[in-house]
Amino acid sequence: NDWYPHYIHNLDNLIRFGGLFPPIHVQADIRRTRLLGVTHVPHEGGVLIVRAKDDLYRLSDLKGKKIGISRSMNQIKNDWWRIQEHQGIELMLRMNGMTMEDIQLVEFPYADDWYNFPEMLTPMENPSEWQLKRDHKHELAFRPLETALEKGVIDAMYSQSKVLSVLTEATGKFAIIEDLSKYPDWRLQVANIPAAITCTDVMAEEHPELVVAFMKGMIKVGRWSNEHKHAAAAILNKQTYYLDVEDTYRGIKDVDMVPNLSLLNLAAVEQGTNFMFKKGYIKNDFDVHQWAAPEFLEKASRELLEEEWKRVTTSKLPQTAAALETDRRIG
């Protein structure tokens, strides 16, 4: 199969895990899905980058200057990269007493068409291998404005905090003059996050046991990752846009890798949804709390607790204690 299901969820049996903006678009305008859980990197809101050789040190130095914004020519999928550029640029300007009226926004269309390239369609042992088919830390597919900035066609560009921007900065050609991750306000941490886990309503209704099994796996992997952050970083470095394993570790060391549907994280999802609707990136609004389906995460957590209870009590007692074998809530 090609890679469009990750963006338009056109497979009934797909459980999709990734950035926030594509599943918002799917739920709003394409088909009904269920939000199963999210994981949040709470301090990666985005940065503004300039050429190191230019006399630009503060955002106010960009008054009247050109800031680039990309535009995907791909009509099949959501233009998630542009959305986070748009949102991030607006927020950085606002935090510095400026608006879009103070700068020149220069649009850069690009093909964005790699999703069905022949090299992307070869068999894989694991779906997460898709990044391994690409030199993702060095190719510019997710840094589409870097060349324009280097050539001086624009004066500044958006990038994500810590991830991606570190790869740009490491060249020595560029410098970061504003970083949303430095602010305490969670509303500024909007770079296509929190990452969302979604499934179709078809799968949720016809095969809930598969959804629960998947969420059990996500909880177990998340717990392992929380307890073994360096080992997790070595694995994740193969797919992330940090510099290397140690940089990946620094990026994830304070991140809770177990998915949840906390009120704060749902509010962050609402932040992204509201922006997309207000700016016309989705046609239809929807209630994020109705989209959320916590029953699968709850059942998965309960089953894992029961399995652990059984394992522990079986080794200590002549027969398994039955305290968790009821559907009644405990506590």
Regions found by a protein language model. Give the residues of each.
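Short, glycine-/small- and polar/acidic-enriched structural segments
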Residues: 1-120, 161, 323-331
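Well-formed, non-transmembrane alpha-helical positions, independent of function
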Residues: 25, 61, 147-148, 166, ...
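Short linear loop/turn motifs
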Residues: 104-108, 249-257, 287-302
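Pocket-lining segment of extracytoplasmic ligand-binding domains
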Residues: 114-238
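Secondary-structure end/capping motifs
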Residues: 204-283
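Conserved C-terminal helix/tail region of periplasmic/extracytoplasmic solute-binding proteins
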Residues: 277-331
